[in-house]
């Protein structure tokens, strides 16, 4: 079964029969052979965490990390495999209500319509973020993704860590003038808090609630797009500078050279540091954030029955029970 999955992955992850596609297939097969001990251990861990049915629902995307970059351009294949395996072990063992496997699955974590019509916070794992994290926290306005943060969880030296691999705004299919108008209106609705900043605060709340000890965000120089896998020119097309975004939100250097450390504490300004004419707005903003935090904490682990499941996730609890005992906790990134 495991060998069949690996063979299938070569044809699925690198489709087509052009010279380039055949070359990519050969490169992937070579990487699989080189990393076979680590890949074999990885698939055993994934099967123990998810069960055979769960692993089938997840698909073969996870095997692709033996070849392509993941979260950071600096990570080698063994580290990439380790983090993916740890992510699913953590969720399956500790937070099964947040375990998303299929690319069409999503969880509505928090309705924000009382603050801005049609807005909500949604957790999902769309295919285009497959190299930047296993989960994506999004701010939606109706069906439009206004802002997204892709991340993975893993356990390192006994502590739970969260690694952010991407931050994204409204897609390029929406013209810039319309996008700016949406951002402007939402910033007004959120009491002067930009949509991306609201999303970062929501992710920090999620991290605190799950017991995350360290929150890391990939540096701009180490974004996965800058890996040689994509060629020499791909990195030149990137618009947003991640370093600027993270530093605006209190980031500092971390013990991982390719990641910043973000503070877990919620942002809060002392009243004496706020101009008098803006204090009322900041008080309303704090009420908004407190409401969002309370809503998130109410539906995160311990209250899984409150989560609104979408797509075809099915009954996570039943599937986990059928998969056997929970896997042991394994340290990553040693």
Predicted features and spans:
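Terminal substrate-recognition subdomain of acyl/acetyltransferases
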Residues: 1-134, 142-147, 155-160, 172, ...
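Short, contiguous, well-structured surface segments enriched in hydrophobic/aromatic residues
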Residues: 162-168
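A solvent-exposed, charged loop/short amphipathic helix patch at secondary-structure junctions
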Residues: 170-190
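Conserved acetyl-CoA-binding loop-helix of GNAT-fold acetyltransferases
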Residues: 191-204
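Short amphipathic alpha-helical segments, especially helix-boundary/capping motifs
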Residues: 111-113, 176-181, 198-199, 219
């Amino acid at each position: 079964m495991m060998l069949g999955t690996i063979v299938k992955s070569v044809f699925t992850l690198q489709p087509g029969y052009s010279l380039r596609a055949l070359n990519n297939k050969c490169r992937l097969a070579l990487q699989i052979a080189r990393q076979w001990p680590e890949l074999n251990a990885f698939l055993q861990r994934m099967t123990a965490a998810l069960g055979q049915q769960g692993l089938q629902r997840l698909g073969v995307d996870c095997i692709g990390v033996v070849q392509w970059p993941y979260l950071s351009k600096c990570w080698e294949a063994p580290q990439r495999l380790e983090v993916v395996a740890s992510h699913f072990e953590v969720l399956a063992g500790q937070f099964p209500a947040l375990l998303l496997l299929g690319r069409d699955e999503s969880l509505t974590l928090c309705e924000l319509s009382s603050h801005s019509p049609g807005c909500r916070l949604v957790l999902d794992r769309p295919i285009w973020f497959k190299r930047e994290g296993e989960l994506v926290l999004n701010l939606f306005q109706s069906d439009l993704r206004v802002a997204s943060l892709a991340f993975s969880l893993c356990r390192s030296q006994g502590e739970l860590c969260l690694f952010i691999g991407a931050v994204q705004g409204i897609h390029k299919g929406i013209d810039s003038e319309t996008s700016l108008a949406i951002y402007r209106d939402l910033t007004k609705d959120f009491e002067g808090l930009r949509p991306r900043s609201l999303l970062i605060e929501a992710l920090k709340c999620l991290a605190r609630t799950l017991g995350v000890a360290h929150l890391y965000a990939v540096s701009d120089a180490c974004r996965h797009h800058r890996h040689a896998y994509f060629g020499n020119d791909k990195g030149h097309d990137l618009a947003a500078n991640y370093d600027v975004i993270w530093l605006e939100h209190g980031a500092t250097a971390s013990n991982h050279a390719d990641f910043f450390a973000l503070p877990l504490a919620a942002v809060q300004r002392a009243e004496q540091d706020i101009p008098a004419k803006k204090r009322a707005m900041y008080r309303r903003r704090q009420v908004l954030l407190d409401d969002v935090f309370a809503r998130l904490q109410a539906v995160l682990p311990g209250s899984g029955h409150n989560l609104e499941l979408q797509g075809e996730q099915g009954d996570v609890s039943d599937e986990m029970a059928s998969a056997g005992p929970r896997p042991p906790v394994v340290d990553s990134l040693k």
